Amino acid sequence: MGKDSQNYYGKHGTPQKYDPTFKGPIYNRGCTDVICCVLLFLAIVGYVAVGIIAWTHGDPRKVIYPTDSRGEFCGQKGTKNADKPFLFYFNIVKCANPLVLLEFHCPTPQICVKQCPDRYLTLLSARNTRDFDYYKQFCVPGFQNNKGVTEILRDGECPAVITPSKPLAQRCFPAIHASKGVLMVGNETTYEDGHGARKNITDLVEGAKKANKILEARQLAMQIFEDYTVSWYWIIIGLVIAMVLSLLFIVLLRFLAGIMVWVMIVMVILVLGYGIFHCYMEYSRLRGEAGSDVSLVDLGFQTDLRVYLHLRQTWMAFMIILSILEVVIILLLIFLRKRILIAIALIKEASRAVGHVMCSLLYPLVTFFLLCLCIAYWASTSVFLSTSNTAVYKVVDDTACPLLRKTCNPETFPLRNESLQCPTARCQFAFYGGESTYHRALLGLQIFNAFMFFWLANFVLALGQVTLAGAFASYYWAMRKPDDMPAFPLFSAFGRALRYHTGSLAFGSLILAIVQIIRVMLEYLDQRLKAAQNKFAKFLMVCLKCCFWCLEKFIKFLNRNAYIMIAIYGTNFCTSARNAFFLLMRNIIRVAVLDKVTDFLFLLGKLLIVGSVGILAFFFFTHRIRIVQDTAPPLNYYWVPILTVIIGSYLIAHGFFSVYGMCVDTLFLCFLEDLERNDGSAERPYFMSSTLKKLLNKTNKKVAES
């Protein structure tokens, strides 16, 4: 038996030995992993430099405003096109050219206009009539009516024809509609191409479709943005409700941990049960309605997601998912009912610890603020980098011109000899790009931007974990709680983390950031290789993605426990990670059961809060609450604010529960160390509370004798 124990501990390190001077987090400590601290500082300096360069070269207007053939923005204030917000295509049919999909730009002249055409006219019919005054606004700026029709069309100064159009994403598209199954523009089923020939409306449809493919995503984004502008204050109210519920739940958990856990379990089951009932009622209501039996596969992807809610198959899928989730939760509760009692006791102990360090509940706000700074800097830098390309002009022509698609300068092109080879060619804005060293390095800068975001975000999270671990470890290792605790345990732990362990936090977050950026690159490669038919490559990609996902989860778990050891002992990252890993391996059964059951209970708490707020948001934004039915704003997609509230509620609940989670993990690790260091004798008494000692049938002999 002794040999087996020796071999076991040899594999997983040696147990902690009794140290009479150890009274909790060590105060006399030195700086750890200084090299990583210096590396983080240099990386931040480089990140700031990248941001400055991006802000110098970038121009977000390229994303906001459409651009005409001269590379000028439509509708931008302070420019000559300030009163011309719409982009007009001379010949929308040419947008059906494959060049559109290659360079995302139609090979036809484009100008900024005040309004889209509202009537059908051709240059031939409008010339020398009163209609030409209206027609001229769709010609190039500075147009002089001193040429013949042929010369005007050859030089691309006016469109051959204008058709009734409607603005979409600040672009003018033909107002095509169907009347009794026949496509029409205005009252016409055909249109004149401006050269005396009549063509079918379907040609316009093809051109509009190709141009519209580029804009579908932007249109969806604009509609989502509109929904946010009219519902943002209701979203904030929903998030405030989630915050109040989370805080109320935490406060109640402080005093009624056992009852609250069981109430939480019952409420989650009831919420899921109501979800199943609601899905069944919607499924039954749609029975017999026209179009409700269409399958999701036949329908395909639709930008208007409300279409899916009119399908019976959608509600059937929701009902099956919720039913499976309900059954899984009930089975877990049945088989883990005894372990749940132990987890409740651990939560009660965590409640006492949080009660003595109440300011810890506010620390997630600090983490949230720092993460918002990281996200804002990353997003703005990413936008400026993506818009720091310069305008690229290329030769466009309807004939087989040898200069076709070659780069040109619009100011000098008409004067150069090359233009004589193709008299009808035009030098037109194509896209934003560049061939300088800076432009070639843009992809690398974007990768660096993403990597630094992961590194800094993980560093912020690590700082919060070390701070909370130090505060709660001070509680556990106080023999007389709370008399032996320091005056300000949270601030003391925060100061120690920044002063001594910035390098260790940078080291741990760097390892995690490397794995995360590799996962992002794998996702990028997977998207690029989706069209490939090589099954081995697909299999290899799936394996790599799975392996790195597991690796990320393991590193997060190891880092979390390493940070607890850093907060207690002040050792470097590698030593702390090794000691934490061996300590957990020596108590693997307790780790697998107690810790994970507690995590499961916290997850149920998050689901209860998110489910409650989500159901309330659903009924409000779908105008199903009669008292406030007229208050809810009209929306393009009511799922936009609902999903935002649900995701935001989860993040808020996660922020509050993360304090409890870190407290439980810290107390659990301290408890394992306590069992190894001490034996309950008068010389080596346990530091754990009387509740935990009773739960585990442990006693201090001195207390037992008295």
UniProtKB/Swiss-Prot annotation:
It is a multi-pass membrane protein. Keywords: Antiport, Cell membrane, Glycoprotein, Membrane, Mitochondrion, Mitochondrion outer membrane, Phosphoprotein, Transmembrane, Transmembrane helix, Transport. The keyword Metal-binding does not apply. It catalyses: choline(out) + n H(+)(in) = choline(in) + n H(+)(out); ethanolamine(out) + n H(+)(in) = ethanolamine(in) + n H(+)(out). Disulfide bonds: none annotated. GO terms for molecular function: antiporter activity; choline transmembrane transporter activity; ethanolamine transmembrane transporter activity. It comes from Mus musculus. Residues 55-232, 278-315, 386-454, 526-563, 621-638 are extracellular. It is found in: Cell membrane; Mitochondrion outer membrane. Glycosylated, glycosylation differs from tissue to tissue. The molecular mass of the mature glycosylated protein is highest in kidney, followed by lung, colon and spleen, then brain and tongue. This is Choline transporter-like protein 2. The modification Phosphothreonine is found at residue 14. Glycans are attached at residues 187, 200, 417. Coiled coil: none annotated. Belongs to the CTL (choline transporter-like) family. Choline/H+ antiporter, mainly in mitochodria. Also acts as a low-affinity ethanolamine/H+ antiporter, regulating the supply of extracellular ethanolamine (Etn) for the CDP-Etn pathway, redistribute intracellular Etn and balance the CDP-Cho and CDP-Etn arms of the Kennedy pathway. One of its GO terms (cellular component) is mitochondrial outer membrane. The gene is Slc44a2. The keyword DNA-binding does not apply.
